[in-house]
């Protein structure tokens, strides 16, 4: 889905080697304020090495995202997954 008017962080190192990436963005689709380019730019991931379930969203600064059904669905699904009791047993 398209994300308009949001802030994109640039990493010095790609986090992909340490996490399980759920979504990424095409760096050619936006303009950065830095010369650092990763090519593959993860924006949503989980980190299975942690004890607690976690989902990291690199974007979500714009309130417009909460009007986007695809983003809302992904956000709700991530909350449901992190809060599931049956995964603790």
Where in this protein do the model-derived segments appear?
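Active-site-proximal beta-strand/loop segments in catalytic clefts of secreted hydrolases
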Residues: 24-26, 57-61
């Amino acid at each position: 889905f398209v994300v308009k008017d949001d802030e994109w962080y640039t990493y010095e190192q790609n986090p992909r080697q340490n996490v399980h990436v759920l979504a990424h963005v095409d760096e050619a689709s936006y303009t950065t304020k830095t010369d650092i380019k990763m090519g593959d730019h993860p924006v949503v991931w989980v980190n299975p090495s942690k004890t607690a379930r976690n989902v990291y969203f690199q974007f979500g600064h714009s309130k417009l995202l909460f009007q986007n059904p695809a983003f809302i669905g992904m956000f709700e699904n991530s909350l449901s997954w992190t809060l599931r009791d049956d995964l603790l047993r």
